[in-house]
């Protein structure tokens, strides 16, 4: 595990605990920067019950006796680590270094040049419920962003089965403030995070690039969506409400049956009864994504999908 400043963010801490519980995985090294020499329990007391090594400064020599490397670093840093991988290594990156398929798109959205362009083709943007079968072909796995996960899971089946009109998709997403990173309190120092709901990145949020890239894989038709993210007064969680117009003769029942069929064998995606209203609290401290389907009848028939995720990436 290589993480910025130890294990301070919820996705890294949760991921470390989940990996430790796997009987066939042995955590060899934990790496950080200013946290070198400390125990992870200093940052997260819930990790005290696990026998974990002290945090080290990353050195490429540490890669000799490991097979899988998890990185949760500022954008750009996993690119440097990726240069030291052998054919026997698998890198799983929680940041955005390998989410985009074109180096030019990475420069456009992240305002920095990609430093491992030759490895982009050796990486995959992996959302297991959608493209799990591709995983064995690549040794660099890029985990999707939090917003795109909550958006792509509901939309994928509808795109693939041509159930919705593609010219007016409205995505309204709300995230807990942990998703804004460790510097959230400095960044929003003039706002009360606990008493405020704020839109941000309207029209140019970086996750637009991921959503657009993946939706293009689902259809050859032209499509248009508007995505508005919000920072909400909760620590973690994602609530995405997606408004779509149904194609002619497509019913809410058809949409629901399609979703159920697509995810019937997926343990982390749960499709609920039509009309069910949810809250992020329904999935807190789980790895689940709940999807609910509602019909909006005024002023025109419109299908509303809601998805809930427990944590931010």
What function would you assign to each model-found segment?
Residues 164, 195, 206, 220, ...:
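Short gly/pro-enriched beta-turn/loop segments at secondary-structure junctions
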């Amino acid at each position: 595990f290589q993480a910025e400043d130890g294990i301070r963010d919820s996705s890294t801490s949760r991921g470390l605990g989940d990996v430790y519980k796997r009987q066939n995985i042995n955590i060899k090294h934990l790496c950080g920067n200013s946290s070198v020499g400390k125990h992870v329990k200093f940052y997260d007391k819930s990790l005290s019950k696990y026998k974990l090594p002290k945090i080290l400064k990353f050195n490429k020599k540490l890669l000799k006796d490991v097979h899988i490397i998890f990185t949760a670093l500022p954008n750009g840093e996993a690119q440097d680590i990726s240069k030291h991988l052998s054919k026997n290594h698998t890198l799983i990156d929680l940041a955005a270094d390998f989410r985009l398929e074109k180096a030019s798109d990475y420069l456009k959205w992240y305002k920095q040049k990609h430093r491992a362009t030759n490895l982009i083709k050796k990486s995959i943007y992996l959302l297991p419920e959608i493209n799990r079968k591709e995983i064995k072909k690549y040794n660099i796995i890029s985990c999707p962003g939090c917003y795109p996960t909550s958006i792509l899971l509901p939309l994928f089946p509808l795109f693939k089965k041509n159930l919705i009109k593609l010219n007016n998709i409205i995505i309204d997403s709300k995230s807990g403030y942990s998703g804004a990173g460790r510097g959230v309190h400095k960044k929003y120092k003039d706002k009360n995070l606990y008493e405020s709901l704020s839109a941000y990145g309207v029209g140019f949020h970086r996750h637009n690039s991921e959503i657009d890239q993946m939706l293009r894989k689902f259809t050859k038709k032209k499509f248009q969506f508007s995505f508005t993210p919000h920072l909400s007064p909760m620590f973690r969680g994602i609530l995405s409400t997606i408004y779509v117009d149904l194609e002619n003769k497509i019913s809410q029942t058809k949409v629901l049956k399609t979703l159920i069929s697509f995810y019937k064998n997926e343990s982390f995606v749960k499709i609920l009864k039509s009309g069910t209203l949810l809250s992020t609290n329904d999935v807190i401290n789980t790895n689940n994504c709940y999807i609910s389907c509602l019909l909006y009848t005024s002023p025109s028939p419109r299908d509303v999908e809601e998805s809930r995720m427990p944590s931010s990436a």
